[in-house]
């Protein structure tokens, strides 16, 4: 029996090693631009880094103990979680005990809004947001309205920025929460979260910001911007999918999300996803180590593509702010061209772009973000989003520009 178990164990290890060998061969091909695809949808998700996978592997195969157990084998799993928590906290300038692990950005947004409102119900029932938030925020607030909460939706200007004056004017004694995203997932516009935080603090209102698109792209030092709650998602910064975190400033009133065990300081029960937590912690370290270099590199690539497209293709409009914009985001309207048809033509050339948020790409309605900017429905339907990342190369953008020129010309002839 023991011999059979040993043989089975070795066979399992051999299979795992074969899988990893194949995975890393594919990964190296992608990293060396040998992939058949030009991937320009980094706002939807990012490829997991090789170093992240290597960090995660032992927690699938060898170090599998439940971190809630008290024996030494389990303490190693708990220590790994603590290390990841500390690594993430360092990137934001906060305390490790203020970081709570979740299943991703959507859960973090839901928890921040629903459970702070629940904890603050005796103070008031008014929440302020903007019209261009991610649907994880907007749909949650729609539910809040259905159960008696009042929500103010701030307009944005043509670049996608809120008015600080309108924000301050919207605050009243019943206001308990402001939730404004750090940077928009469709147009890349960065909101003035430092000023928003100061306004919220002056009025004694909690401030939550959805940092899913911004984290890893711009420096964020939470103590300086008076943020009480901050959401992020691992797969947006080269970590695994299905894992995220919520920063909750110490002493911020918030109710527990899940009932059960004592995990996450009794606020989110359930056995931790150790491997993914470890992977996200590693990804957070890596992306912040290279952030300054990547911001410059990606900004140059972004500006190169925008300049060439605007110069070489007629009737093109850039959406969002050029100055206050994420370094990897390009959102373009090609007048007289259906965005979905353009996406399909680019896909036939193995170029991956988006018509908007990946979370809503199957919906037939125009982008609520673009409509809030003042675009017509026709213009909104004529828009694509290109987002670049660490593996994007200038040669890929050159090929994309040529494909865009040909595709747009062909589609305009047919319209």
Task: Describe the residue ranges of each PLM region.
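Extreme N-terminal basic, low-complexity initiation segments
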Residues: 2-8
């Amino acid at each position: 029996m023991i011999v059979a178990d040993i043989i089975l164990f070795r066979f399992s290890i051999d299979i795992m090693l074969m899988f990893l060998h194949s995975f890393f061969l594919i990964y190296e091909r992608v990293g060396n631009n040998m992939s058949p695809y030009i991937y320009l949808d980094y706002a939807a998700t990012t490829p997991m880094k090789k170093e992240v996978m290597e960090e995660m592997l032992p927690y699938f195969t060898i170090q599998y103990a439940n971190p809630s157990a008290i024996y030494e084998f389990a303490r190693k799993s708990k220590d790994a979680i603590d290390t990841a928590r500390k690594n993430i906290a360092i990137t934001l300038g906060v305390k490790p005990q203020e970081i709570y692990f979740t299943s991703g950005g959507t859960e973090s947004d839901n928890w921040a809004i629903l459970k702070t409102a629940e904890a603050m119900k005796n103070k008031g029932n008014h929440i302020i947001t903007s019209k261009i938030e991610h649907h994880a925020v907007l749909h949650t607030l729609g539910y809040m309205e259905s159960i008696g909460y009042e929500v103010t939706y701030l307009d944005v200007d043509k670049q996608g920025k809120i008015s600080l004056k309108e924000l301050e004017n919207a605050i009243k004694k019943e206001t308990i929460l402001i939730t404004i995203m750090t940077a928009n997932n469709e147009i890349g516009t960065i909101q003035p979260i430092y000023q928003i935080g100061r306004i919220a603090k002056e009025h004694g209102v909690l401030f939550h910001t959805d940092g899913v698109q911004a984290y890893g792209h711009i420096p964020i030092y939470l103590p300086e911007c008076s943020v009480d709650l901050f959401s992020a998602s691992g797969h947006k910064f080269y970590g695994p999918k299905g894992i995220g975190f919520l920063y909750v400033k110490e002493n911020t009133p918030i109710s527990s999300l899940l009932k059960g065990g004592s995990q996450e300081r009794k606020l989110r029960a359930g056995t931790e996803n150790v491997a993914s937590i470890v992977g996200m912690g590693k990804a957070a370290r890596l992306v912040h180590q290279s952030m300054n270099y990547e911001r410059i590199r990606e900004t140059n690539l972004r500006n190169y593509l925008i300049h060439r497209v605007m110069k070489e293709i007629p009737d093109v409009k850039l959406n969002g702010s050029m100055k206050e914009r994420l370094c990897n985001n390009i959102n373009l309207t090609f007048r007289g061209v259906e965005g979905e048809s353009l996406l399909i033509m680019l896909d036939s050339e193995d170029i991956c772009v988006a018509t908007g948020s990946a979370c809503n790409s199957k919906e037939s309605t125009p982008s609520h973000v673009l409509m809030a900017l003042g675009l017509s429905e026709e213009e909104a339907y004529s828009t694509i989003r290109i987002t670049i990342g660490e593996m994007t190369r200038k040669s890929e953008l050159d090929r994309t520009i040529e494909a865009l020129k040909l595709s747009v010309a062909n589609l305009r002839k047919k319209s």
